């Protein structure tokens, strides 16, 4: 840590811990949201591979997870989008747990969360304007990644 000079003394000293912003509460919330994102994405992944339709989140024609999860847009280069979600949230969870060990974590967390948000916004556009139906699980995942992106921005601004 850089040395600081106090106004009443010309002696250099280590900065006290209160001058360093603690982002731990933000990373804890990010970790909890990432676990929630893993759960939502895992349920969506299960629905992607399920043989039968369920009424789990098929509440109306306009809200039908099975239509979204079985559409041509439910895979990206042959990988289920929900599987990408599970992997992405797992990476975010890992970053949220190692944040004190690596100084680059806030930047990578923000970049990853923003990439996930852009992808989720694209998929939400497809739901609403191409498929003309909404997936409640997908909208939940969008809310989670938007929250993580916001927190990533807060964390990043506090570490500068």
Model-derived features: positions:
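Membrane-interfacial helix-loop segments of redox and metal-homeostasis proteins
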Residues: 2-160
């Amino acid at each position: 840590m850089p040395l600081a000079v106090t106004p009443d003394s010309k002696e250099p000293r280590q900065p006290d811990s209160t001058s360093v912003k603690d982002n731990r509460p933000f990373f804890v919330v990010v970790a909890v949201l990432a676990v929630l994102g893993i759960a939502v994405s895992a349920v969506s992944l299960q629905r992607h591979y399920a043989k039968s339709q369920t009424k789990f989140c098929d509440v109306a024609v306009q809200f039908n997870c099975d239509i979204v999860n079985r559409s041509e847009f439910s895979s990206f280069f042959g990988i289920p989008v929900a599987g990408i979600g599970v992997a992405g949230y797992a990476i975010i969870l890992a970053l949220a747990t190692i944040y004190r060990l690596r100084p680059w974590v806030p930047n990578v967390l923000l970049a990853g969360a923003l990439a996930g948000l852009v992808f989720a916004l694209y998929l939400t556009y497809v739901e609403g304007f191409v498929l003309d139906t909404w997936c409640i699980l997908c909208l939940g995942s969008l809310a989670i990644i938007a929250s993580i992106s916001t927190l990533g921005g807060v964390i990043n601004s506090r570490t500068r």
